[in-house]
């Protein structure tokens, strides 16, 4: 399947909270099959749900999102892209969190926005 969008953890979290009307309207316009999230983002969201104890309402929101958004597996090609990306950015003095770099590598390796 060819995806157009890879939702970052923060975007999915905002969708789950339901407070941003403009974001919700834009997301509703995305066709099923156009959007995905990295398994790294899914792991971050699961961690947050379990850590903060608001799991019931937010977990239900995440399950609703999962009806429209696929979770993409971390593959060998994504891992190779991650290594190259981190190395190149480090040479330029740019350091981001490991999770952010992993999600960026996922998007780059699959040519997704």
Regions from the PLM with identified roles:
Residues 1-37, 49-64:
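Short, well-structured N-terminal submotif of metal-dependent ribonuclease cores
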Residues 3, 70-113:
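Active-site neighborhoods of divalent-metal-dependent phosphate/nucleic-acid chemistry enzymes
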Residues 12-13, 43-46, 72:
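Nucleotide phosphate-binding site architecture
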Residues 8-9, 23, 45, 82, ...:
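Generic structural signal for small/hydrophobic residues in well-ordered secondary structure
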Residues 14, 47, 80-84:
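Generic alpha-helical structural context detector
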Residues 32-34, 68, 111:
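A generic structural signal for alpha->beta connector loops
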């Amino acid at each position: 399947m060819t995806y157009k969008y890879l939702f970052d953890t923060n975007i999915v979290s905002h969708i789950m909270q339901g407070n941003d009307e403009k974001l919700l309207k834009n997301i509703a316009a995305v066709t099923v099959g156009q959007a995905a999230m990295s398994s790294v983002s899914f792991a971050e969201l699961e961690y947050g749900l379990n850590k903060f104890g608001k799991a019931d309402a937010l977990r239900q929101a995440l399950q609703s999102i999962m009806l429209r958004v696929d979770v993409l597996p971390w593959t060998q090609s994504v891992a190779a892209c991650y290594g190259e990306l981190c190395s190149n950015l480090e040479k330029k003095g740019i350091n981001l969190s490991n999770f952010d770099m992993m999600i960026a590598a996922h998007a780059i390796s699959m040519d997704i926005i």
